[in-house]
């Protein structure tokens, strides 16, 4: 099946954050014409290959790392720029990046037609193993059980990691279940969860070989 372009650009500006996101669910070339970044960029979450362009700049290093993993293993091209009120804490930046990414995903996906709708995935990282299940249901709901013990990983509060996923699911209008099944290193637990989610999303948005709406209702809206 030949997919439509499945690209989107989202600009979200509040008193707390300024965010720009460009996404292509199919990978390939994307760009942001006018960058909002006024700081020196980090190359830690930047990757350009023949099939993907990924550049994540939220100002929170571990959040960049998680979004990079999500984009990489979903097969997306993704650029995220955020200027947030990090002098307060990481809450608004993390939450708003989740919201903006969910909005961009929903816009890029368009009508849920001709795709599998459901996806699931497992991903290990050393001793950690996570499971994710996704439904492109237009019924936003998230159940996130990561079992994190630390207060922070780098500059990212551990309580904000599930909240990012909840914010993404709400804005994307998808049902999302993510569980870390085992593991003792919180970095590994978190990263395996984002990779499992990527695998699940990649399956859910893949072709089902028809042009049908995958619902007994005949609509997902």
Curated annotation (Swiss-Prot):
GO molecular function: imidazoleglycerol-phosphate dehydratase activity
Pfam families, sorted: IGPD
Domain of life from the UniProt record: Eukaryota
Catalytic activity: D-erythro-1-(imidazol-4-yl)glycerol 3-phosphate = 3-(imidazol-4-yl)-2-oxopropyl phosphate + H2O
GO biological process terms held by the UniProt record: L-histidine biosynthetic process
Top EC class for this record: lyase
Record pathway: Amino-acid biosynthesis; L-histidine biosynthesis; L-histidine from 5-phospho-alpha-D-ribose 1-diphosphate: step 6/9
UniProt keyword annotations, A-Z: Amino-acid biosynthesis, Histidine biosynthesis, Lyase
EC number, as in UniProt: 4.2.1.19
NCBIfam families given in the database record: PRK00951.2-4 (NF002114)
Family under the similarity heading: Belongs to the imidazoleglycerol-phosphate dehydratase family.
Protein name: Imidazoleglycerol-phosphate dehydratase
Species: Kluyveromyces lactis (strain ATCC 8585 / CBS 2359 / DSM 70799 / NBRC 1267 / NRRL Y-1140 / WM37)
């Amino acid at each position: 099946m030949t997919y439509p372009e499945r690209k989107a650009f989202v600009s979200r500006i509040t008193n707390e954050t300024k965010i720009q996101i460009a996404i292509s669910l199919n990978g390939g070339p994307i760009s942001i014409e006018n960058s909002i970044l006024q700081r020196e960029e980090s190359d830690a979450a930047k990757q350009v290959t023949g099939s993907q362009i990924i550049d994540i700049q939220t100002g929170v290093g571990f959040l960049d790392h998680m979004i990079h993993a999500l984009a990489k293993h979903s097969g997306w091209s993704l650029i995220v720029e955020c200027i947030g009120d990090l002098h307060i804490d990481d809450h608004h930046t993390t939450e708003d990046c989740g919201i903006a990414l969910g909005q961009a995903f929903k816009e890029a996906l368009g009508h849920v037609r001709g795709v599998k709708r459901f996806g699931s995935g497992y991903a290990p990282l050393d001793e950690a193993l996570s499971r994710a299940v996704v439904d492109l249901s237009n019924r936003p709901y998230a159940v996130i059980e990561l079992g994190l013990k630390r207060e922070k990983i780098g500059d990212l509060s551990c309580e904000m990691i599930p909240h990012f996923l909840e914010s993404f699911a709400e804005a994307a209008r998808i049902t999302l279940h993510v569980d870390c099944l085992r593991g003792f290193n919180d970095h590994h637990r978190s990263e395996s969860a984002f990779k499992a989610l990527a695998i699940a999303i990649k399956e859910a948005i893949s072709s089902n070989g028809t042009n049908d709406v995958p619902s007994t209702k005949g609509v997902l809206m």
